[in-house]
Curated annotation (Swiss-Prot):
Any Gene Ontology biological process: defense response to fungus
Superkingdom to which the source organism belongs: Eukaryota
Keyword Secreted: yes
Keyword Secreted listed: yes
Known function: Antifungal activity against C.albicans ATCC 76615.
Record key words, sorted: Antimicrobial, Fungicide, Secreted
Disulfide bonds: none
GO cellular component: extracellular region
Protein name as annotated: Antifungal protein 1
Length: 31
């Protein structure tokens, strides 16, 4: 609980791009 999972980093970022408005930012980063 105290220590964050290593997968959370990538998963959270991807989730934020998919659910957030960071789609433009994600596009520039992933594409």
């Amino acid at each position: 609980e105290s220590a964050p999972a290593p997968e959370v980093s990538g998963d959270a970022v991807f989730s934020a791009i998919q659910n957030g408005x960071l789609k433009n930012l994600g596009n520039a980063f992933f594409w």
